[in-house]
Amino acid sequence: MERDLESAPPSAPRPPLGPPLSSSIGLALLLLLLALLFWLYIVMSDWTGGALLVLYSFALMLIIIILIIFIFRRDLLCPLGGLGLLLLMITLLLIALWNLHGQALYLGIVLFIFGCLLVFGIWIYFLEILWRLGATLWQLLAFILAFFLAIILLIIALYLQQNWWTLLVDLLWLLLFMAILIWMYYHGPRHTDEHHHDDSLPHPQQATDDSSHESDSNSNEGRHHLLVSGAGDGPPLCSQNLGAPGGGPDNGPQDPDNTDDNGPQDPDNTDDNGPQDPDNTDDNGPQDPDNTDDNGPQDPDNTDDNGPQDPDNTDDNGPQDPDNTDDNGPHDPLPHSPSDSAGNDGGPPNLTEEVANKGGDRGPPSMTDGGGGDPHLPTLLLGTSGSGGDDDDPHGPVQLSYYD
């Protein structure tokens, strides 16, 4: 499942919404200026228009609010601009109801009730948006109280029919919407990174390097398997903690090395992450008969306890280490050869740490007599090349002898 998610190509990101055209901004600014002039003319005039004058000035103020939202925060046109547009339609409906009679009046009242319910629903939706943006309960309560206070003051203005009171009510509505805009400007998701990088997913360049490494080393897979696991189907000569210069911590199931492939389809018996492996190297289970890798930090050995505090360079389950083993521990020794072309340390870890039995019950690794000699003089075959004259690996096999 994880491999499917890693191998799936990322979906194409949605292009960000660009700024509005200069012509649309110019038209909006012109309409905003005209609306402000008409609003000031209506409010400051000596007309005795009564309640209709209050509704006309309030409708112009709603148009001004919608234009301000369009110019400065177009992303809020859906919730906040829609709320202002519905309030504008309800205001125009009230102006029409003033001259309706009979059945048309009842129909207008029904439409007015439906419009008020729709405004209430959009207001609840807008409060949910504020809640998701991090608004506290007290902030939401303050917005609700300010909204209902503005409605009550508008009703009072309809009864008073005074120009100065209408001016104060309209400015209160403008301040309410501007306060919401300012709050969302400082608390909204601004400058979000749509291409969020997940550190658990492999880098595309790393995936390319892994595939090229696999294609280059497929021809040496059989010889590599014989050198590390010995002739025949017997147990391997040494565990993965001795590493090889040709291997690498790519942590993928297709690696031809015996380092750490972490997948059940590996061609080797080193670390395929399953309790049914024919070897005792790394079956990722606490009931293994060896002390190699039981996936627990309390193991008596220093091989692979899956913790970042291990003193060895064996396998602490991380692909970012400067060595060829895969240890992911902050206390690992520095790389031996920084000039390695693969970016790793270019060589196996300290053999004295891995070959010597550090008081654990693991014992020496599996060994062979090296060709039928004295059984008390075993040799270990290390590396990935078969003979010293192989052009693929100039280092050749490394032999290490144990003496009684």
Swiss-Prot record:
Question: Region labeled CTAR2 — which residues?
Answer: 370-404
Where does the record place Low complexity bias? 251-322, 375-384
Keywords attached to this Swiss-Prot or TrEMBL record, sorted alphabetically, are: Activation of host NF-kappa-B by virus, Host cell membrane, Host membrane, Host-virus interaction, Inhibition of host innate immune response by virus, Inhibition of host interferon signaling pathway by virus, Inhibition of host RLR pathway by virus, Inhibition of host TRAFs by virus, Inhibition of host TYK2 by virus, Interferon antiviral system evasion, Membrane, Oncogene, Phosphoprotein, Transmembrane, Transmembrane helix, Ubl conjugation, Viral immunoevasion
Transmembrane segment boundaries: 24-44, 52-72, 76-96, 107-127, 140-160, 164-184
Superkingdom of source: Viruses
Q: How is it modified after translation?
A: Ubiquitinated on the N-terminus.
* Biological process terms in GO annotation: symbiont-mediated activation of host NF-kappaB cascade; symbiont-mediated suppression of host JAK-STAT cascade via inhibition of host TYK2 activity; symbiont-mediated suppression of host TRAF-mediated signal transduction; symbiont-mediated suppression of host type I interferon-mediated signaling pathway; symbiont-mediated transformation of host cell
Q: Region entry Disordered: which residue ranges? A: 194-404
For whether the record's keyword set contains Membrane, the answer is yes
**Subcellular compartments:** Host cell membrane
Where it mainly occurs, coarsely classed, is host cell
Q: Which GO terms describe its cellular component?
A: host cell plasma membrane; membrane
Please list the residue ranges that the record places on the Cytoplasmic side of the membrane. Answer: 1-23, 73-75, 128-139, 185-404
Stated membrane topology is: Multi-pass membrane protein
- Compositional bias, Basic and acidic residues, is annotated for 210-224
Pfam families assigned: Herpes_LMP1
Statement: the UniProt record of this protein carries the keyword Methyltransferase: no
Q: Where is this motif: Interaction with host TRAF proteins?
A: 204-208
**What interactions and quaternary structure are annotated?**
Interacts (via PXQXT motif) with host tumor necrosis factor receptor-associated factor (TRAF) proteins TRAF1, TRAF2, TRAF3 and TRAF5. Interacts with human protein ZMYND11; leading to negatively regulate NF-kappa-B activation. Interacts with host UBE2I; this interaction induces the sumoylation of various cellular proteins. Interacts with host IRF7. Interacts with host TYK2.
Q: What is known of its domains?
A: Two regions, C-terminal-activating region 1 (CTAR1) and CTAR2, have been identified within the cytoplasmic carboxy terminal domain that activates NF-kappa-B.
The record's family statement is: Belongs to the herpesviridae LMP-1 family.
What is the role of this chain?
A: Acts as a CD40 functional homolog to prevent apoptosis of infected B-lymphocytes and drive their proliferation. Functions as a constitutively active tumor necrosis factor receptor that induces the activation of several signaling pathways, including those of the NF-kappa-B family. LMP1 signaling leads to up-regulation of antiapoptotic proteins and provide growth signals in latently infected cells. Interacts with host UBE2I and subsequently affects the sumoylation state of several cellular proteins.
Task: Report what the protein is called.
Answer: Latent membrane protein 1
Task: Name its species.
Answer: Epstein-Barr virus (strain Cao)
